[in-house]
Amino acid sequence: MEKLTKQAEEIMAERFGKDNVIALATVENGIPYVRSVNAFYDNKAFYIITHALSNKIRQIKGNPIVAISGEWFAAHGKGINLGYFGKAENSEIAEKLRVAFASWIDNGHNNFNDENTCILCIRLTDGLLLSHGTRYAIDFSD
């Protein structure tokens, strides 16, 4: 496994630096749970808009280690609830999410007046990326 190379980062940004559906797996009481989520990749992390009272946030609070998979990429990471979407500290990533998710973000599914509407960050730790016959085993740690 090697550190994230420039070439692998370019593939990640091109492939996932927009609206994507990925599988997000969590574990609670030894039982795995997986669901599809819309996600956006930026700087070694995936970002997801969700609700603070959702099962995924509860499960991540109990065990922050998660797994993801999508479009010839699988990885482990640490789930971090960044809190309310509208918090000043989240303004930069929130704007990126508004652009990436523009086709559906304001369709009524999200209530941005609800302080439980939050941003989930999946900070990647390690992963496997496949692209045109090349296998990239990546260590995302700093």
Where are these regions (language model features)?
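A short mixed-secondary-structure module that forms the rim of ligand-binding clefts
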Residues: 39-73
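A short, Trp-centered hydrophobic/proline-enriched beta-strand micro-motif
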Residues: 14-28, 65-69
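Extreme N-terminal tail/first-helix region
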Residues: 1-18
